[in-house]
């Protein structure tokens, strides 16, 4: 119903002869409080934390895939490649040269998006409490997971290594 009201109000503006600034009576508030989602504990202390974390979420991701029947993971890498991509991002975040460690999928933007999507799809089966608000999943990913922190650290490392701007900047939302 809400979407219909917004569209109808927008269509009413088509008849205006001058520019119009209209305010919709309902405001959607953005809630950036991270959603509550328990991640399985570390299993293998001998591998980087984001790799171990991604492997631990695989069962939840698979359940979400069965429940939904589809996934948005796969623009650059598939679910099987998420741990390997996180391994490379971890190497970059800890000082390795971005030119020496090849990222599967090649495109940092779509690889980062696939990793985030993998996590968010897995999380939907693990989330507790009320329905997550707008940006709650984003906040959880970047603030509450090893993978999110690794992407942000890799982004900073790439910037510090003077990698091309588009290569690192778009790995995460600009406000991050």
Please report, for each region that a protein language model flagged, where it lies by residue.
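Charge-patterned, long linear interaction tracts outside catalytic cores
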Residues: 19-85
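Extended non-globular C-terminal regions
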Residues: 63-176
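Short, structured coil/loop segments at alpha-helix boundaries
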Residues: 1-4, 47-51, 144-148, 155
């Amino acid at each position: 119903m809400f979407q219909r009201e917004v569209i109808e109000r927008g269509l009413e503006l088509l008849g205006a002869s001058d520019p119009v600034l209209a305010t919709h009576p309902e405001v959607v508030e953005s809630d950036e409080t991270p959603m509550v989602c328990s991640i399985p504990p570390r299993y293998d202390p001998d591998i980087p934390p984001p790799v171990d974390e991604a492997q631990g979420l695989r069962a939840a991701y698979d359940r979400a895939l069965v429940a939904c029947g589809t996934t948005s993971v796969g623009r650059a890498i598939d679910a099987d490649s998420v741990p390997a991509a996180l391994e490379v991002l971890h190497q970059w975040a800890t000082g390795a040269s971005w030119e020496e460690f090849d990222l599967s999928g090649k495109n940092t933007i779509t690889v980062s998006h696939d990793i985030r999507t993998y996590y968010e799809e897995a999380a939907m089966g693990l989330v507790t409490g009320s329905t997550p608000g707008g940006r709650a999943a984003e906040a959880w990913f970047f603030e509450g997971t090893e993978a999110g922190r690794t992407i942000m650290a890799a982004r900073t490392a790439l910037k510090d290594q003077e990698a091309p701007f588009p290569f690192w900047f778009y790995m995460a939302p600009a406000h991050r």
